[in-house]
């Protein structure tokens, strides 16, 4: 089922999400719906707060990039209760966008190597070091779980330059090709 994506201005996007337990109701269905919603909206990542749930669940698919990056073939993964333990490596600037910020794309600096702990869909714990593009996507999505958005990493000048677009979202007038839940 395709779910509406919550747009900038929705309070859930600024809340710190809670860890969940294996007893969380209908988790497999939720994860399937998150993948379907993300792919339908042409995203590579989706955090549960973006569909209105303040819980620590993220889905990432890099498969759409596999034509240029064969190592991403069939990469579809859910992360439960993820936490970044360490950010390192070279700081790299790259343009980012966000399904909760339709029409906004800005350059963001992030470390290109992270250590992350998370659980998979079977609640098996993992501790991994991740580099490159996946490290960036993880940082972006995991920020959502801490009530942050990529625009929080922008300079005051860049934030001022996108203020008009943000105000449009705050008025509930954002436009996109996918189903959204806007501020009323």
From Swiss-Prot:
Identify the taxonomic lineage of the organism of origin. Bacteria, Pseudomonadati, Bacteroidota, Bacteroidia, Bacteroidales
Give cofactor(s), names only.
Answer: Fe(2+)
Keyword Hydrolase part of the UniProt annotation: yes
Alphabetic keyword roster: Hydrolase, Iron, Metal-binding, Protein biosynthesis
Family matches, as InterPro entries = Peptide_deformylase (IPR023635), Peptide_deformylase_sf (IPR036821)
| Annotated family | Belongs to the polypeptide deformylase family.
Q: Which superkingdom?
A: Bacteria
Top class in the EC scheme: hydrolase
A molecular function annotated in GO for this UniProt entry is: metal ion binding
Instruction: Summarize the protein's role.
Output: Removes the formyl group from the N-terminal Met of newly synthesized proteins. Requires at least a dipeptide for an efficient rate of reaction. N-terminal L-methionine is a prerequisite for activity but the enzyme has broad specificity at other positions.
Q: Which reaction does it catalyse?
A: N-terminal N-formyl-L-methionyl-[peptide] + H2O = N-terminal L-methionyl-[peptide] + formate
Q: Which gene encodes it?
A: def
EC assignment: the record states 3.5.1.88
Q: Show the HAMAP family listed in the entry.
A: Pep_deformylase
The residues responsible for catalysis, as annotated, are 141
GO process terms (BP): co-translational protein modification; translation
State the name under which the record lists this protein.
Answer: Peptide deformylase
User: Do the record's keywords include Metal-binding?
Assistant: yes
Which PANTHER family does the record match to this protein?
PEPTIDE DEFORMYLASE
Query: In the record's cofactor note, how is the cofactor described as bound?
Result: Binds 1 Fe(2+) ion.
Sites binding Fe cation sit at 98, 140, 144
């Amino acid at each position: 089922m395709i779910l509406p994506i919550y747009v900038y201005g929705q309070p859930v996007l600024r809340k710190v999400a809670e860890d969940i337990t294996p007893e969380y109701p209908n988790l497999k269905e939720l994860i399937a719906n998150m993948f379907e919603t993300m792919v339908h909206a042409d995203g590579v990542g989706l955090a549960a707060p973006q569909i209105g749930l303040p819980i620590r669940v993220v889905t990432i698919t890099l498969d759409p990039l596999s034509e240029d990056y064969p190592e991403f073939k069939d990469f579809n993964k859910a992360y439960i209760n993820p936490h970044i333990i360490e950010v390192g490596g070279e700081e790299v600037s790259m343009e980012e966008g966000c399904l909760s910020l339709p029409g906004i794309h800005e350059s963001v600096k992030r470390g290109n190597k992270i250590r992350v702990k998370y659980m998979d869909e079977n609640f098996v714990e993992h501790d991994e070091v991740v580099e490159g593009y996946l490290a960036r996507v993880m940082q972006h999505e995991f920020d959502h779980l801490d009530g942050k958005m990529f625009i929080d990493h922008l300079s005051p000048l860049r934030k001022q330059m996108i203020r008009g677009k943000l105000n449009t979202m705050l008025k509930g007038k954002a436009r996109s090709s996918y189903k959204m839940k806007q501020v009323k």
